[in-house]
Curated annotation (Swiss-Prot):
Protein name (record): Bublin coiled-coil protein
Record flagged with keyword Coiled coil: yes
Lineage: Eukaryota, Metazoa, Chordata, Craniata, Vertebrata
Biological process terms in GO annotation: intermediate filament bundle assembly
Record's keyword terms, sorted: Cell junction, Coiled coil, Cytoplasm, Cytoskeleton
Family: Belongs to the UPF0184 (EST00098) family.
Superkingdom as given in the UniProt entry: Eukaryota
């Protein structure tokens, strides 16, 4: 007869397989306590992650609003003012910020 894992000539009656738990109630309580502590740490980590994620979204929205305001100020300049300053719209960032705003709005 083969054993439980396909091992040849091993049977339960041989005494090699012991299904009795050697753990007492104290060991189970210690394991449960450790698992509760790990669960608590994971909950705390999840709360911190959620908080940081919220702050990141606020920062990204603030940055997007600042770029929109900056772009609006640039569009209020006449071409004569831009050439007098020696800077063009392309030198100040062009449409790269707009593309980033579009990606943020789309959620990518």
């Amino acid at each position: 007869m083969s054993g439980p894992n396909g091992d040849p000539n091993i049977s339960v009656e041989d005494g090699l397989i012991n299904d009795d738990d050697d753990f007492g109630s104290e060991e189970y309580e210690a394991i449960n306590s450790m698992l509760d502590q790990i669960n608590s740490y994971l909950d705390d980590l999840e709360e911190r992650n959620d908080s940081l994620n919220g702050k990141l979204h606020e920062l990204m929205e603030s940055n997007r609003q600042a770029r929109l305001e900056f772009r609006a100020q640039l569009s209020n300049h006449t071409p004569q003012e831009d050439s007098a300053d020696g800077e063009s719209k392309e030198e100040l960032g062009g449409d790269a910020g707009w593309e980033n705003d579009k990606k943020i709005d789309e959620g990518s």
